[in-house]
């Protein structure tokens, strides 16, 4: 699926007034929250980012919370991107290596921790836009391109022990 091109056209329960971003029950982005499990921009072939967007912390107010890992070129094989999300923190992994943690701020309200309500989970390959184009104009010779996802799995943590992040071993077995 694709997001609407007009940021004010999202299906939401928000009013059209200017105050919509200051209302806790408004489910429009960034109020609703977003966790980018994987963000990749083409001009940084070896870099993968995990990002948490909230009303209190997103690109408009320069308070974005993100982590980055530098790895082998990610466009040559499938990689495992893992997210461990709990009531107090969010951890991101690539191929079993931890590289980002977002800790719930002390005294957090909905503006900095909306992740106890419905929110967006995103896998993102950026071509164009302010970030994806930061390396210069888009080279049209790269098209057509595609993002392939082998699988997405969601597990519920039972709360009795820390979740385990599994790594694939040689041969593709677990």
Go through the PLM ranges and name each one:
Residues 1-174:
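GH16 jelly-roll
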